[in-house]
Amino acid sequence: MISVAVNGYGTIGKRVADAILKQPDMRLIGVAKTSPNYEAFIAHRKGIKIYVPQQSIKKFEESGIPVAGTIEDLVKASDIVVDTTPNGVGAQYKPIYQQFQRNAIFQGGEKAEVADISFSALCNYDEALGKKYIRVVSCNTTALLRTICTINKVTKVEKVRATIVRRAADQKEVKKGPINSLVPDPATVPSHHAKDVNSVIKNLDIVTMAVIAPTTLMHMHFINITLKDKVEKKDVLSVLENTPRIVLISSKYDAEATAELVEVARDLKRERNDIPEVMVFDDSVYVKDNEVMLMYAVHQESIVVPENVDAIRASTRLMSAEDSIRITNESLGILKGYLI
């Protein structure tokens, strides 16, 4: 049983903490919070131990939230830390993990140099075995890599061109925008996503562009893939249908908008309305000779959660990629095939 600490209890951290509680081979020691907001109150109500910076203990106790100890205490009590702090903050915590000789999983908001390896479970799990510091790539990069590595099973992927329509903010981020604008992210080409993909697939010819749209629900990707050999559409659809963490969306559902997909998640009683699978619109799959085009939606709040669970097992050499991915999927109810 591996003892896991989660440093940060926001959008990703609370989902990772809940996922760890569902794993048969992991034990959640507690979570770290810096302010006694509603997420801290909910964690306390769930019975999760809360650790805070030394200077914040009084503030938490005055708010009525018991403190189990400092963040240093949390790190010491664990075998491995999943750092889900805001972008760039994880690198500031790394010296503490090093001080106590603890393995750590970082998120895609950190620079690749913070870790020994950037990670995508379907692409390079075996390369991450035993690595002390692993960086789970961002939500958009996770979706790109899942898709690319899946289609690579049909025949070698030689070139990728992708356009990313990014959501402006998560639903709880009330101070972010835009409200009524499309914003290049950035106007220069390629966007950072191409470099991030190359941190996992080193020599792939990939160019990405991105724009921020005034929505909070999901990202959308429009991707053009050039393959080494000619392929048939049925082969592409088959590999997408039979790969875990990818689901197909049929036009029969009459649910193709991201808002409608959120409603599907609600009706399926998905926790927090999460869809951690890449959602490929099957009608969008176009194949001509060695060229493949497709469109898919990405739920940014949950897609990296199973990757974090697998990264824990890879770092600690708990089990093989096949076994870890299977157990993670089963414990979290992650599908393959068609969403409905």
Swiss-Prot record:
The active site is at C139. NAD(+) binds at T11, I12, G109, R167, Q300. Disulfide bonds: none annotated. Signal peptide: none annotated. The keyword Heme does not apply. Keywords: Cytoplasm, Glycolysis, NAD, NADP, Oxidoreductase. GO terms for cellular component: cytoplasm. Pfam families: DapB_N, Gp_dh_C. It is found in: Cytoplasm. D-glyceraldehyde 3-phosphate binds at S138, C139, N140, H193, A194. InterPro entries: DapB_N, GlycerAld/Erythrose_P_DH, GlycerAld_3-P_DH_AS, GlycerAld_3-P_DH_cat, GlycerAld_3-P_DH_NAD(P)-bd, Glyceraldehyde-3-P_DH_2_arc, NAD(P)-bd_dom_sf. Its main location: cytoplasm. The keyword DNA repair does not apply. It catalyses: D-glyceraldehyde 3-phosphate + phosphate + NADP(+) = (2R)-3-phospho-glyceroyl phosphate + NADPH + H(+); D-glyceraldehyde 3-phosphate + phosphate + NAD(+) = (2R)-3-phospho-glyceroyl phosphate + NADH + H(+). One of its GO terms (biological process) is lysine biosynthetic process via diaminopimelate. It comes from the Archaea. GO terms for molecular function: 4-hydroxy-tetrahydrodipicolinate reductase; glyceraldehyde-3-phosphate dehydrogenase (NAD+) (phosphorylating) activity; glyceraldehyde-3-phosphate dehydrogenase (NADP+) (phosphorylating) activity; NAD binding; NADP binding. Its EC number is 1.2.1.59. Pathway: Carbohydrate degradation; glycolysis; pyruvate from D-glyceraldehyde 3-phosphate: step 1/5. Belongs to the glyceraldehyde-3-phosphate dehydrogenase family. HAMAP family: G3P_dehdrog_arch. Homotetramer. This is Glyceraldehyde-3-phosphate dehydrogenase. It comes from Saccharolobus islandicus (strain M.14.25 / Kamchatka #1) (Sulfolobus islandicus). The gene is gap.
